[in-house]
Amino acid sequence: MKGPKIAIVGSGAVGTSFLYAAMTRALGSEYMIIDINEKAKVGNVFDLQDASSSCPNFGKVVAGEYSQLKDYDFIFISAGRPQKQGGETRLQLLEGNVEIMKSIAKEIKKSGFNGVTLIASNPVDIMSYTYLKVTGFEPNKVIGSGTLLDSARLRYAIATKYQMSSKDVQAYVIGEHGDSSVSIISSAKIAGLSLKHFSKASDIEKEFGEIDQFIRRRAYEIIERKGATFYGIGEASADVAEQILKDTKEVRVVAPLLTGQYGAKDMMFGTPCVLSRKGIEKILEIELSNTEKVALENSIKVLKDNIKLAKL
C-alpha cells in the first residue's frame, strides 16, 4: 500500500486520538509514533496495531525516532505538559512548553523533514510560532491548530440553539486559542442566512452572548470533569490533515503565520485558511464589525506580550 506517511510527536491522549482518527479516514500508508516515554510509545503502537488488524486500510503503525522523519509527509505535534485541573489557562503553560517545543523543533529540523507540520501543543499559537522560528521551515508548511476547535464548538452551539445541522452553520472564532479569542457574530450564517433570520432582533445579542460563554467555558468544564480534552481536537486535526494530504482546497480555521492580515505581522493565530498539499494555500481575512475589531486587537496584544515572555 502506497500513500502518505504520517508521524506524531507525543503519544498522549491528543496524539493518539489524532492518529486513530487519521487511520479511520485511511489517510496514510504508514504511521509513526515518536515519544520520549518509550514505554507509552510502544504500548500505543501495539494497541493501534491491534486496531489495524481489523481493517486493512488502516496502514502500518511503527515506533520511531526523529532521525527517520526525512521521507514523511505530515507531522502532528501534541507533546508538552497538559493544562492542569482547576482553571489553569493555556498561556500559563507557556514557559515549560516553549522549551519542550524548541527541543522538538531542533530534532525535526536535523532530520531533513520537508513536509507539513500541524501543531496542537498548548498554548498553541506560541508553540507554533516557536516551532516556526526554530526550524526556519517555509511558513506555509507550519500550521497551528489555532481556533479550529473553538470554531467547531461555535458551530455546534449555534446548530443546537437553532435546531439545525452543524454542517449548515458557517461561523468562525479567530485570534488566540484561549481566553481572548473572538467569536464572529457579524458574519455568522446558517444555510447562507444571517442569524437574524432565526432569532428575534432584540434577542440575538443576548443569545449570542450565551453561545460565546458556552464555547469559552467548554474546555475548562471538560478538563474539570475528565482531566483533558482530546477527542474533539484529535478529530478536528485529522480533518485538517485530510484536507492537506488530499489537496482539497477547502477552508478550515487554523493558525498560519500572519503577514499583515488584521494588522498583525510575524505572529500566528486562528483565521480561516485555504488548505492544500502545500499546507496553507491562502490566508482569508474576515470582515469584522467595530466591536470585533477591538476584541481582536486585544487578542493580538495578549499574543504579542506572550511572544515577548517566550523570548523568541
Swiss-Prot record:
The modification Phosphotyrosine is found at residue 220. Coiled coil: none annotated. Its EC number is 1.1.1.27. GO terms for cellular component: cytoplasm. It is found in: Cytoplasm. CDD domains: HicDH_like (cd05291). Gene3D superfamilies: Lactate dehydrogenase/glycoside hydrolase, family 4, C-terminal, NAD(P)-binding Rossmann-like Domain. NAD(+) binds at residues 14, 35, 66, 103, 120-122, 145. It holds the Pfam family Ldh_1_C. Pathway: Fermentation; pyruvate fermentation to lactate; (S)-lactate from pyruvate: step 1/1. It catalyses: (S)-lactate + NAD(+) = pyruvate + NADH + H(+). SUPFAM superfamilies: LDH C-terminal domain-like, NAD(P)-binding Rossmann-fold domains. Substrate binds at residues 83, 90, 122-125, 150-153, 229. The keyword Transmembrane does not apply. Keywords: Cytoplasm, NAD, Oxidoreductase, Phosphoprotein. Its main location: cytoplasm. One of its GO terms (molecular function) is L-lactate dehydrogenase activity. GO terms for biological process: glycolytic process; lactate metabolic process; pyruvate metabolic process. HAMAP family: Lactate_dehydrog. Catalyzes the conversion of lactate to pyruvate. Belongs to the LDH/MDH superfamily. LDH family. This is L-lactate dehydrogenase. It comes from Mycoplasma genitalium (strain ATCC 33530 / DSM 19775 / NCTC 10195 / G37).
